[in-house]
Amino acid sequence: RQWSRGLGDVYKRQVLPKPSVNRLIQHRLAEKDFVNKLNIRTTRYVSVEKKSDIETLEDFLPGILKTTTMGYDGKGQYPIKKIEDLDSLNIDFSKGYILEKLVKLKKEISVIITRYGNNNFEIYEPIENTHQDQILKHSKIPAEISKKILDQSKNWAQTIAEELKYIGTLCVEFFIDRNENLYAVSYTHLTLPTISC
């Protein structure tokens, strides 16, 4: 993924989405900090630099410890229910990590938004995702969600795209908890292999 780092310098023509945006969305801690500044709810999270940090963070458990960069489809992710779980996990703390507190999850959805031209948008119907062992198993559209969640997820996706000044197609992932609260999880591209016709 680090190919994006030098694109702005290599090409004289403008590269879209901007390489700076790609760098932001490759860093889990940075992307959550960005969304929080927009008053968009995320799950509780905290930066972790060493094992002893987690030993003082019982309030964030049960949670998932994730590398701040790289890792996808369950890679670089460690579910932790209690402090003692750390003893059985082989974690390389020379890397940066983020600890995210688990929510009582009802379902996960994604909103696809395309921003183009003079601040024009196309926002598509939310997609409902099903995971197994932290890996996406299948997706369906439209998602079975309330009108409140439908409107809020589309609004938040548009806000994120606007504030990023994003040009292109963006996928914003959300959690819905059992009390119908919405949480922004991450934002990334949507790849063709996920779509079946």
Predicted region positions:
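Single conserved hydrophobic/aromatic residue that forms the stacking wall/gate
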Residues: R1-Y11, H189-C197
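Aromatic/hydrophobic pocket-lining residues that form π-stacking "cages" and hydrophobic walls in ligand
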Residues: I54, A157, T188
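A short beta-strand motif that forms the metal-chelation/ATP-contact edge
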Residues: E180-Y187
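Acidic/polar active-site rim loop that often engages polyanionic ligands
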Residues: V35-I40, K66-G74, H131-I141
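Conserved N-proximal alpha/beta basic substrate-recognition cap immediately N-terminal to
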Residues: R5-D59, M70-G71
